[in-house]
Regions:
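Long, charged/polar, soluble alpha-helical segments
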Residues: 1-166
Length: 166
């Protein structure tokens, strides 16, 4: 049972509780069943459940580490993409003219840039804390919001450039 408990703690440290919850939960349940059998003095069953718990915990640690690496990669990619989109938005905002650029930049785009800068910092902080799933989701949302703001800012400009129909 001690080996099973140690394997479960290792799995939790590897992120299995977040990234491989089914396998991790099965390991914990098997350990509980092992303890239950030991209190009933059925030591053979207790040993079987403890061995099962250890194997499940090792599988959970392996799966959790793999999934965590995948989500970390997705989060880092999403943050890079959002940062690039933010740079595009900032360039568009500056291209509205160096003098009084803030006055000429549409308010929704300006607001989206300001919020994206704050949210992007939060996504980077989440990655530093190893909270990869929220970081990935936040970065994807930032990217979409900024893209929508860029599109909205360009629509009036596109309409203004058209000639009236005769």
């Amino acid at each position: 049972m001690n080996q099973a408990q140690g394997a479960i703690e290792t799995a939790r440290a590897a992120g299995a509780d977040r990234y491989a919850p089914e396998e991790y939960g099965a390991a914990v349940a098997a350990l509980e069943k092992s303890r239950e059998m030991a209190t009933q003095r059925d030591y053979r069953q207790a040993l079987n459940f403890a061995l099962d718990a250890r194997e499940r915990a090792l599988d959970a640690a392996r799966s959790g580490a793999e999934r965590m690496a995948q989500v970390r990669s997705e989060a880092e990619t999403a943050v890079r993409t959002a940062a690039q989109t933010l740079q595009i938005a900032q360039a568009r905002a500056k291209s509205s003219g160096p003098a009084r650029a803030a006055d000429k930049t549409p308010a929704p785009l300006r607001d989206a840039i300001t919020q994206a800068e704050k949210d992007l910092q939060e996504a980077r902080s989440a990655i530093a804390r190893q909270d990869y799933t929220p970081a990935r989701d936040l970065a994807r949302a930032i990217d979409q919001r900024v893209r929508d703001a860029i599109d909205a800012a360009e629509q009036p400009a596109a309409k203004a450039g058209r000639k009236p129909a005769r």
